[in-house]
Structures are given as structure tokens and as C-alpha cells.
Amino acid sequence: MIDLSPLARHLVGTPLAVWAQGLQAQLDSKMEKGHGDLDRWQSALDALPNIQPSEVDLLNDLALDTDCDDATRAQMRTALMGLCPWRKGPFHLFGVHVDTEWRSDWKWSRVAPHLDLKGKRILDVGCGNGYYMWRMLGAGADSVIGVDPNWLFFCQFQAVQRYLSEPKAWHLPFPFEDLPANLEGFDTVFSMGVFYHRRSPIEHLLALKDTLVKGGELVLETLVVEGDQQQVLVPEDRYAQMRNVWFLPSVPALMLWLRRAGFSDVRCVDVSVTTVEEQRGTEWMKYQSLSDFLDPEDHSKTLEGLPAPMRAVIIAKK
């Protein structure tokens, strides 16, 4: 059982206190319904060695270490392999390098310099396995709550959390839509790699705004295309072999949408083309990756002939 009472205690006296009181029952209900692979993933978690880190680095990396023998490292590696595929990372856990599909540290290095997270209550929407949540704590956040309905990501988060004493990070295996309206309790909300999966992008922006305190900050990272304020790509069918991609606006269009949704001080802090070095298959993620989704003759296009993935980071205030 996952005990959320520390979360409820931590949020006493904040605008999130009432919501936090009901989270344990909500989580228990989700756990009861479960997932067909949960027992297998739980077995992998149970197989992790019982050790404590003497070194923890969440600021410059995601690294935990201590003196341990080769047998312990082998046990760690086997258990973590039982939680494949690993998509966001990398993680350096007691001598085991979890070489994830994404070099998420590269993205974080593009985002973090533009933020002051010290003492902030943070919501990470579509948090995946929690890689960025740990990096947010490393940057000084007071607390981080991540929501993502993917059970494997939830288990991967638990694998790291068990080695950190009283971390102020909590992964809730809920969709964003399960959060109550008008929470207005977070200082910063992140939506990274989520926006283009939304059928109603403006509704998503409004929902994100509703989670923020007045003056709070949104960090939005999403796929974009070149063009002016009226340029938006809506794929006919698939985009880079993904069926669930809906709207890819230009940066000026996205900034306009944010202003229309009531955000202010809207600024673009980074635009980067995703490379096959940043997203690729590894022994920890053996399925197809970006190189399989691009035109083999021209990496500036997807297999469908659309512009290859380019991502922007937009920061805005409520």
C-alpha cells in the first residue's frame, strides 16, 4: 500500500489541503482495480536490493550511489530491467546506468535555466516515470505532485522513491482530468509532451490555469511547426507513426492561444529540433524510436512527409 498521509500533512494550511485529504481513498480505489501487469512489476520492485544511498544528486543529474558489491549491482540491474521499457531518464542508480529512450537531461538543461523553483509547490501533468519531478526537487522545489495514469511509470517512480528518505515528491496514477476544477493551489505547473495529445488544446490550457495560484507560472513544452500566428498543423492521420497527435501550432500561434486563455507575460525560451541522439532505442527500451519514424532519406520529415519533431518551451503567468 502507498501511504499518502505524508502528502496530506505536507499540504495542511495550503489551498490543496481539502483535496489532499481525499487522495488516499482515490489511490486505494485505483490500486484495487489495478492493471494486468501490476503483479509482475511489483515483483520487480520487491526484488530491488535493500540498500541506502550515501550520495544523492538530483541537481546536476539523477544519481544515487553507495558502496556496494557486484552482486548487489547485478541484483539492482535485474530488478530494474523488470520494469522495462524505460522512456524518460537517464538514471544512475548504485552503479547501474539506466540508459533510457530519451535524454531527458538534455531537455531539462534547456528548461531549468529559465525557472526559479525554490520553495515552489509544483504540479507535473503527464509526469511519466517522475524523472523531471526529481530534478525539480533538486532545483529546490518545496514539493512536487505528478499525475500520469500509466501504471508502469508509477512503478518506475516507486523504484527510485524507495531509496530516498522522506522525498517531497508524489506520483499519482491518475489522469489530469481526475483533478478537481479550480484547485488554484500550485505555484508552478508543468505540461511537457502532453499538449499535442489533447483534442481540445484551449480547454487544456484553461484547465492548467485553474490549477495555479494567482501569479503562478505555467511551463508548457510541446511539438510546434514553423509559421505565423495562424499556422497550425493538424495531421490527417498519423504523425511520426502516432495516431493521437492533434494540434501542432507555430510558436506565435501557441503564444496567441495562451494569451486568449488568459495567461500573461507569455515568452518562448527554447525551440529545439529533436534529434535521433536525444530519442533513440537502447537496451532499456528495445522498441521502435525516432529514427524509425523519420524519412530515412530526409530526417527533416516524418515517414508521413510532415515536418520532423521540433519542440518549444513556453513560459507564461496566470
Swiss-Prot record:
Keyword annotations from UniProtKB, A to Z: Transferase, tRNA processing
UniProt keyword annotation of Repeat present: no
EC number(s) on file: 2.5.1.-
SUPFAM superfamilies linked to this entry: S-adenosyl-L-methionine-dependent methyltransferases
InterPro entries per record: CmoB, Mo5U34_MeTrfas-like, SAM-dependent_MTases_sf
Record Gene3D superfamilies: Vaccinia Virus protein VP39
GO molecular function, one term: methyltransferase activity
Positions with a binding annotation for carboxy-S-adenosyl-L-methionine: K88, W102, K107, G126, M192, Y196, R311
Gene Ontology biological process terms from the UniProt entry: tRNA wobble uridine modification
Domain of life: Bacteria
Catalytic activity: carboxy-S-adenosyl-L-methionine + 5-hydroxyuridine(34) in tRNA = 5-carboxymethoxyuridine(34) in tRNA + S-adenosyl-L-homocysteine + H(+)
Family annotation (PANTHER family): METHYLTRANSFERASE, TRNA U34 CARBOXYMETHYLTRANSFERASE
Subunit structure: Homotetramer.
Entry-linked NCBIfam families: PRK15068.1 (NF011650), tRNA 5-methoxyuridine(34)/uridine 5-oxyacetic acid(34) synthase CmoB (TIGR00452)
Role description: Catalyzes carboxymethyl transfer from carboxy-S-adenosyl-L-methionine (Cx-SAM) to 5-hydroxyuridine (ho5U) to form 5-carboxymethoxyuridine (cmo5U) at position 34 in tRNAs.
Protein name: tRNA U34 carboxymethyltransferase
Gene name tied to this protein: cmoB
